[in-house]
Amino acid sequence: MRHRDSLGNDTTVNSGEVEYVTAGSGILQTSAFTPTEHLQSVRFWLNMPDSEKMNDPDYHIIKKEDTKYIEIDGAKITLLAGTLGDSEGYQGKHLPLDLYDVEMAANTTTVLPTPEDRSVMIFVMNGEIKAGGTAIPEKSVAKLSQGDRITIEASSDASFLVIGSLATNERVVWGNTIIMTNERDVEKAYHELEKGTFLKIQG
């Protein structure tokens, strides 16, 4: 995938890599995918605290060589960001983010550690699993309850993402890709887009 943005970045994100974008005070970007027979891409948003929303925007690619591979109870885990046990991956500049890509074979069980201070969710990309005894079908998201570990059972070959961070406990208001804590700031951002004053930092 080719990525271009208002910071001046013009890069290619390859298979197995992660682009880590901090929107901050504002960034405009385009993504163009190379034609291929099979493509699976996931994009999610991590809401920053209101006090950090106007920080400088930033862009970083987590390369495959910067990820770590871990095996727990037969589950093959790619540590993309954050920490897992004693292993550490890429650390963002703001909220802590734990991001794992997990593959499990059919009819296997694994227990993954989950920091008790984190809000954790699972996105099942392929197959079907049970988390804490609750079934999560393919292409579904489940938010986990608080605890220091979670038991995962795979009824078929499965792959899923585990995503964890600190909860901001703040109101979330969004308009398309503008995410704030109140309607006034969302309207202000769109007004700046119309006036051409949205971008505070450009490359």
Regions found by a protein language model. Give the residues of each.
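Jelly-roll (double-stranded beta-helix
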Residues: 1-203
